[in-house]
Amino acid sequence: MTSMADVIILSSSPHPPRSPGPGRHDTKPVSHALPRSATPPPIRSTSDLSQPHTRSRFFPTPVASNKCPDGASKPKKRLTKDPASETSKQTAPSKPRREAKKVAGAPGTTALGEPQPEAVGKKNDAVKPTKSRSRRNAKSKDSGNMTLAGKVTKTSGDLPSKKSSKGGKKTVATKLSPSEDTSEKSTPKESNALGKDEVLRLDEAMRRRMDWTPPRETAYEEIATVTDRGSQDQDRDSSSSGGFGKLVSDYNYSGSALHPRDFVQNANGEGPTKRRRIELVNPEIQALLNGRYSDSSDQSSGQGENTGKPKKTTKGKPKKFTTLTARMTAQYSKNDAEEDEPVIDCLAGIRTTKGRQKKAKEIEKQSSSTVLSPEAAVEFLNDQDLIFGSCSQLEKDDSPETLRETQQAIRVPEGPSYSKGTHNKDPSAIQESSTRFVSKLAGTRNLWCVGARDTEGSLIQPETLNVVDLTNGEESPGKKSQDDAENPSHNTLQSDWYELEFADIDSPSEKRPSPLPTESVLDSDTQVQAPAPIPADTATATATATAVVKAAKPAKGANDTPTEAVDSQPASSQAPPMPQYTGFTDAELSKQVSSYGFKAVRGRKKMIDLLRQCWESKHGSGSNAASDSQLICQLEQQEEPASKMDNVPKSTSAAKTKATVKPKAGTSIRNRKSLDATKSTSASRTNLQTSPKKNSREKPITGTSTSFIDVEEIQDSEEEIIPSPSQVQKHYTDIYSKSKTGSWVQDHSLDILTKTPSPSPTKRKVVSSDIPAKRPPSSASIATTRMTESSKEISLAEISAQITQAVRLQPQLSPLSSSRGSRSRPTWHEKILMYDPIVLEDFTAWLNIEGLGLVGEDREVGTASVREWCESKGICCCWKKNAS
């Protein structure tokens, strides 16, 4: 009801008002947007609803003021500065003027909007048009639209004008009646005073409204400080009340974010620092500092002797740095007392200056003690022991004893495994070095020894190299000097291995026609019977034979003396017999091996071989001949599968294969008896010439007997008809390493030992006479040679054709397989054609046992050679360990 009363009062009508029809003209509402500070609009009059749609409701029509009564006062009102409304007013100024006249003269509008103001016909009607025209002309000259700021300026003190001002406050964003429109045109001069400034700000507002995101403030003069804060606030207040453009600028960051910075200023004027401001503002810290320095000033003024005590405490501070990193960074880091100095500076500091001087002196003293001249620094660097490690590790004592002990501990495992000058030392020195070496080995068992393996996966035993040195040290100086004089070019370790292999392989057939038949045949007999003591006996007899051969060739009668010496030597040294290692358990064998200073060896036979070699090097080689001859029968009975495996290529019937073991032992016994009875060279020659097959058959037997690796492995698997592939692999690897060296003995005249007895006795006679001269005194490196001599040294070109031929002949000539193979057990050729992975161990065992015998090839191949052959042919092969 108040809004309706306002409309009636603004119309300046003396008659009571009529309530307008509310629902008839609402069908055509004018779409508009209210300003932010606008109040809800009141009910509009009928004259307002009759206005055309193109006109803005914030701007009244200039023609409607002609009909106003005389007593109506014209309220002064600011208009909204809307650019859209401004443009609409500028484009069509005359058209609303004509429409306003029509609306004013319409009968329907007078009946609703104004209660017949023109029909009264008062005297003031002639006066009002002149005033309204002058106002209209002045309004047309104004530039820009006016903003409705929420208040109306007053031009007269009439009661209707006051009421109209109240109505203007309520209808800030509404369209007024024609009478109000004419009365509002009476305030152009006051609005023009502010309009000039507002026009300058409209450009900025337009620029910001195009982007709608206000750009970043770049004006530095707007940053607020403590000094110009009040002036800036005044400018902001005055500018914010200017217009819409400044209202948008108030939302920028520059105005609101500057207030916290005003409090950051330090008392000293050094700039905004958060930490110092907090320390200075806190009153508790100031109280504590004031109390502290009051006490310290009293103490310093009362006692002058106490000034030296802080120096002692400060000297102890560098001891806190326990790392190299802290020691180096201490020169550049501030102490805790130095960090308190900025707080102390703000207070009255008589004490602070003294403290600063003392700290500076202390820093100078520390730097003078650490900094050295270039020459002194170089000398210090040369004198100190370098230890590798990170600088962050805690420091230890800098004493040179600790560093030297550390370096000695580092160098101990890095030392050589054996001394190179052992061959030229006297026996006593050699024995001392040997005992020291054994103790050293006992102390240096680690993962490096465990990880020493060759290409085939078996362990490499570098400890056996030391057994050679020990054996060399145990022999007499006479033999040593003779060997050194005869073999000046064979003192290296590797050449000794090859020469030992020459002597052992050719001993059965080459010693018999020699001028000393008894000793040579005894060597062969001992080799056939005793696997372990062979090397030492062979070395002893060979050394004696070498001396006699070089001096002269005696007759038959002279041959008895060396024989008796050889026979009497075991009898005299038989007191400590070699223990029967074959009867020991695996745990006992490992304990015995560790007692000699060696690491644990994998495999029972390897441990037994190593223990026998160690026992021979310690107690002598001749003392164990008799005990080993007693043990040989038991060992050879346990070797039945191995001898069977060796003799399969030589014999085609199973009966001969089973009967080869006992004739071997019997042959050795008969040879010894015949040696004791006849002791003649002719008998040995007759034996060699009349039984060539037996000698050729004994050659592989000799190789098997000298191969220490097979003895105990066969014993472990003596109940098995076919040995395991790993045993077969090791067995044939050792045999082939000997076969390779046997071809070197005969000056490359023969490839490798063959089936047929082709070598002539005369040729063997020459070779046997030359071999003892080249043979070194030690023969304990045979096992080491077999471990290091792998079968890959065999020429692949020589045997690849035989392997290929054997694979193709298997279904035709193999007695153990079917004629064409079967689905459950295909032949090797069928497996290769079907691209089945060939297990190298099984294929090598078949070649050595059966395959190469089909093509008349007596040589045996190793797993490495078979692998090379498979890779050269493009055959898929794998190891059995990985295949499982």
UniProtKB/Swiss-Prot annotation:
It is found in: Nucleus. GO terms for cellular component: Slx1-Slx4 complex. Phosphorylated in response to DNA damage. Residues 44-53, 620-636, 677-693 have a biased composition (Polar residues). Its main location: nucleus. GO terms for molecular function: 5'-flap endonuclease activity. The keyword DNA damage applies. One of its GO terms (biological process) is DNA replication. It comes from the Eukaryota. Residues 309-320 have a biased composition (Basic residues). Residues 1-324, 394-434, 459-587, 618-707, 753-781 are annotated as: Disordered. Belongs to the SLX4 family. Forms a heterodimer with slx1. Regulatory subunit of the slx1-slx4 structure-specific endonuclease that resolves DNA secondary structures generated during DNA repair and recombination. Has endonuclease activity towards branched DNA substrates, introducing single-strand cuts in duplex DNA close to junctions with ss-DNA. This is Structure-specific endonuclease subunit slx4. It comes from Penicillium rubens (strain ATCC 28089 / DSM 1075 / NRRL 1951 / Wisconsin 54-1255) (Penicillium chrysogenum). The gene is slx4.
